[in-house]
Amino acid sequence: MTKLQEMVTFRDVAVVFSEEELGLLDAAQRKLYHDVMLENFRNLLAVGCQSPNKMAPLDTTGIRCLPLGQLPCWQMTSHDVNKLARAPEDGINTPGKGPHLLEQCHSSCHWGAEQPSQAPEDDGCLENLPSNHSSSSDNQEFLSGRAQSSWSKAHFSERWNHEKHCPQTLVKTKSQLLAPGVNILGCISHHDHNILHKRDKVPSSGDCDQVIFPMTLLTQHCVYREQKAYQCSRGQEVFSDSPSLELHQQTLLGKKSPVHSTHKDTRHSPSVPIQPSVHPGRKRYWCHECGKGFRQSSALQTHQRVHTGEKPYRCDSCGKGFSRSSDLNIHRRVHTGEKPYKCEVCGKGFTQWAHLQAHERIHTGEKPYKCGDCGKRFSCSSNLHTHQRVHTEEKPYECNECGKRFSLSGNLDIHQRVHTGEKPYKCEECGKGFSSASSFQSHQRVHTGEKPFHCSVCGKNFSRSSHFLDHQRIHTGEKPYRCEVCGKRFPWSLSLHSHQSVHTGKKPYKCGECGKGFSHASSLQAHHSVHTGEKPFKCNVCQKQFSKTSNLQAHQRVHTGEKPYKCDTCGKAFSQKSSLQVHQRIHTGEKPFKCEECGKEFRWSVGLSSHQRVHTGEKPYTCQQCGKGFSQASYFHMHQRVHTI
């Protein structure tokens, strides 16, 4: 066991909340705060005991009576407390009458010239106890209910008022002793004092004006900073005190509280190690790189590896390095297959407690993490952080090959396979390879025919979730994709990309046969059927075939008689949207097709094509009977009637 390395004052262990913070605490948290501060002050005495073999000699009862103290409580150091413990050997004599141990914190505690110019931030004086209080059983309710509430409120006020004297009388005469069973500053109560006097045959409390201090308990409370006796039941972490363990367990459970720990009196329980009650939220060690604070120097040293990149812990199986031994222990479970954390609902195992905690929310439906921008909720904090990049447009992961950036590291890994050509996912049915697991899973449904995504509106099923989401916009009318040039909106990104070529004139997809350009790959594929003569889309009614699905759909309306496109001016209906657009020019008088030779204008492109033959002399329609040629099909049909008469 190691000795104390430095003096400890109450300022070092006290924690003070502002008035605003105190207002946020409920009754239970205020009581907890009171208990924490009280326990901290009690254990300040324990800090002063050095080590057991250096304690002052004990009397036959094992109890040392403490004399009058001279310092205010906030100035008490371990040295001062130790001096009080050895008082009889130092020649300090406590009279049989009047006040004793620290009778006044400093009865005229004005902040004068001999005092600090400013009150300490961490005040810890106790409020005056009722002067009429005695040790009788009639006063069992002392420090309970409203009295305790007002006492704790005054006890932990935000800061000292320099115009007030210190309200504390730590321990007064026997007529003003603490309530039975209440231990302050490590002193036993008057009630316990009586018991000890009777048990050990020492003068009764009526003959003794001193508050006695059990030095055996003081010895138990000595601080051994390197001792670690509290181990987490869910992992291998070990802590030097129970508050730190409790704080760690609350972190695992995702709990947060303004008061960081609870303190239970374990002085009389031999099975639980006695540890100091220094508040676990105290941070004494600070990182010079980023300013982050830590309660232990070892935690700071571990954190600094984030900045240095040091990874001293290596996996024997794969050679991967880690900055913390706990991370290495968790990683080893990847190789061993160990999954110590089991879901009680479905039995699924996990390598980490945090993963189990996140999984359990699937069963409970809990989503505690809420996006402040859009209100969307998530079951995992990591999912929330990832989602927030949608709003911030942050893309921290950059491809070294092409410079493209991604919001997720997983998406970057998948993208890099475009450059490497890696396709680790192989289909056993057809041998096709895929760069991502999601693409592979979607492909497998081609063979199985599975369509797990069902539209509740029209009943249509889809094999891919992306296709299902795109389809739903038909019913909702949602158009999330907006053209920045003209403001037109589209339900699908593909439609927006096709539209943007109207403004840019860009047609990146070229036909290898005729050189014609297209703005979209699907348009080029449809055009290829012109050269190949392929017509893969067949009408089930008349068996007519078409090169495009849109042409087949328009044709099928011939059989159904459906005419969904209606003219708002005259009410005439059409089976095709293009036919409606041409018809509307009759009402508007629009003639968009103009002859470059003579300037004549036409409503339809077919009219312009027929007219241009007047200038070119082209006569594509030839009579097989007499060989006469015609520039228009209508003239050709009229001529054929001459031969049939």
Curated annotation (Swiss-Prot):
GO terms for cellular component: nucleus. Residues 8-86 form the KRAB domain. It is found in: Nucleus. Its main location: nucleus. Keywords: DNA-binding, Metal-binding, Nucleus, Repeat, Transcription, Transcription regulation, Zinc, Zinc-finger. A zinc finger (C2H2-type) spans 285-307, 313-335, 341-363, 369-391, 397-419, 425-447, 453-475, 481-503, 509-531, 537-559, 565-587, 593-615, 621-643. PROSITE patterns: KRAB, ZINC_FINGER_C2H2_1, ZINC_FINGER_C2H2_2. InterPro entries: KRAB, KRAB_dom_sf, Znf_C2H2_sf, Znf_C2H2_type. One of its GO terms (biological process) is regulation of DNA-templated transcription. The keyword Nucleus applies. The keyword Zinc applies. Residues 112-144, 255-280 are annotated as: Disordered. Signal peptide: none annotated. Pfam families: KRAB, zf-C2H2. Residues 129-144 have a biased composition (Polar residues). GO terms for molecular function: DNA binding; zinc ion binding. Belongs to the krueppel C2H2-type zinc-finger protein family. May be involved in transcriptional regulation. PANTHER family: ZINC FINGER PROTEIN (PTHR24381), ZINC FINGER PROTEIN 235-LIKE (PTHR24381:SF452). This is Zinc finger protein 235. It comes from Mus musculus.
